[in-house]
């Protein structure tokens, strides 16, 4: 706990030699704190992975063993599984710090709060997004996806899962402190996740049809860049409103 408190102080109070806050140091301090906290609750990470595996594994059992059909639905199933899995950890992105008053301390720190939110978003992706990217090719084998499709799946998820975390941070901030926040969060985010789902799964569908899929990846990348600049300050503003 002392190590965690120390990294929080580092995240909130890092200063340059002339007394100016160092946002990059604060972001890294927040990232380290979030990862240390994750080590104390490994079961939550396992829950995300188990849920992803279950979603991806139940569809072949329900659809049947026909290879052509499995290859057709595989990318969409894996994308839906990744989308739903990222939702599981979003309520805790700000919820626990809101409950114990830590968010108020962060707001009082000299570091721009958006940078601290950025550290939380990166930590969420490393814990709930990156493992899904690494696991997706293994699950893709049960759908009979060829190596080229598996490689494209990984590339699309590398663009799409950070986007899901960024958009999810806004939703988590907007529902902070509300009753039934988990259900409200899902209702709020699922429509916003649709473009990422369409472009991510569409890239693999285009590849399977022999069409150019670069446009889908370009759109995913453009959405990711826009979200990287907009999501942290928007989420920070929403958290500030919820606390004040």
PLM segments and residue spans:
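Transmembrane helix boundary and interhelical loop/hinge segments in multi-pass membrane proteins
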Residues: 38, 87-107, 120-121
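A structural motif at transmembrane helix-loop-helix junctions in multipass membrane proteins
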Residues: 151, 156-190, 240-244
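Membrane-interfacial helix-loop-helix connectors in multipass membrane proteins
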Residues: 62-73, 137-158, 176, 204-219, ...
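Hydrophobic alpha-helical transmembrane segments of multi-pass membrane transport/permease proteins
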Residues: 42-64, 80-82, 192-199, 225-231
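Hydrophobic alpha-helical transmembrane segments that constitute the membrane-spanning cores
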Residues: 47, 118-143, 163, 167, ...
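Junction motif at the cytosolic side of a transmembrane helix
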Residues: 2-4, 228-244
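Long, hydrophobic alpha-helical segments
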Residues: 74-90
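Aromatic- and glycine-rich beta-strand/loop motifs that create alpha-glucan
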Residues: 2, 18-48
């Amino acid at each position: 706990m002392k190590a965690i408190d120390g990294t929080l102080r580092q995240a909130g109070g890092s200063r340059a030699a002339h007394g100016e806050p160092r946002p990059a140091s604060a972001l890294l301090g927040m990232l380290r704190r979030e990862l240390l906290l994750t080590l104390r609750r490994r079961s939550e990470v396992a829950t995300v992975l188990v849920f992803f595996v279950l979603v991806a594994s139940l569809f072949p059992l329900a659809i049947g063993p026909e290879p052509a059909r499995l290859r057709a639905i595989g990318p969409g199933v894996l994308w839906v599984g990744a989308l739903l899995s990222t939702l599981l950890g979003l309520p805790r992105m700000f919820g626990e710090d809101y409950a114990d008053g830590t968010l108020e301390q962060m707001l009082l720190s000299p570091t721009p709060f958006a940078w601290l939110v950025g550290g939380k978003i990166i930590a969420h992706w490393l814990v709930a997004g990156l493992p899904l990217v690494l696991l997706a090719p293994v699950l893709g084998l049960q759908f009979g996806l060829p190596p080229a499709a598996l490689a494209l799946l990984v590339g699309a998820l590398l663009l799409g899962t950070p986007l899901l975390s960024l958009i999810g941070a806004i939703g988590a901030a907007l529902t902070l402190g509300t009753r039934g926040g988990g259900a409200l969060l899902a209702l709020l985010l699922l429509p916003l996740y649709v473009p990422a789902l369409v472009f991510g799964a569409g890239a693999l569908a285009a590849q399977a049809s022999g069409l150019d899929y670069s446009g889908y990846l370009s759109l995913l990348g453009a959405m990711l860049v826009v979200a990287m600049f907009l999501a942290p300050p928007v989420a920070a503003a929403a958290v500030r409103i919820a606390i004040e």
